[in-house]
Amino acid sequence: MEAMDLPCIARLRNGKSATLALAEASDSAELLKFYRAMSEEDRLVLKDDVTTAEWLDGFLEALRQGEAISVVGKLDGEIRGEATLYRTLHGWARHVGEIRLNVDRSARGQGLGLELAHPLVKLAIDRGIDKLVAHMVDSQVAAKRTFEKLGFHKEAELPGHVKDIHGKKHDLLIYANDVSHIWSAMEAMLGDFRPDRATR
């Protein structure tokens, strides 16, 4: 999938339409609003403090440098989900990408996360990425279920590797799979509930 395929309209399971688009600098204020509105529970173990201007500056720079590609999902004109593909452009892990996915609680369970991840997996294939990984902690039960449905499986568990914003330690779970397997699983899932797709 090339950038020209976005924005597009995705039909969710509840019949609503979400607009998917590549994140741009013009989305800065909305992205901060989205992340600052997340509950502390949801932000507790995120890899970065996504509520700060410093994080946003670094995120936008990663987009400019091609080290990250982000897709935002909007419902009723407001961001309700965001997914990012991170990659290393040089070195021995340049064939590996990392996906991070966050969906507002009000929009969960309707397939928005799948719709956000789908174009990123296609972009990973187009850019020669062979393997995708996702990091989460042991308490993120919903995240584990989501990534398992997307075709990921647990490859490693690192005890006490993550310290949350309150200083409590958590086990880090590393989920991964070959991009081709993830793509096949996602296509099968999308075929179950998305008979068509409208683009604009």
Question: What is each stretch, according to the model?
Answer:
Residues 1-14:
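Short acidic N-proximal helix/loop "leader" segments that mark the beginning
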Residues 18-30, 178:
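A short beta-loop-alpha structural element at the N-terminal edge
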Residues 33-47:
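Helix-loop element at the rim of GNAT/NAT acetyltransferase active sites that forms part
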Residues 48-95, 100-106, 117, 178-180:
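Acetyl-CoA-dependent GNAT
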Residues 110, 114-115, 138-157:
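Conserved active-site alpha-helix within GNAT-family acetyltransferase domains
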Residues 133-136, 153-170:
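Conserved catalytic-core motifs of GNAT/GCN5-like acyltransferases
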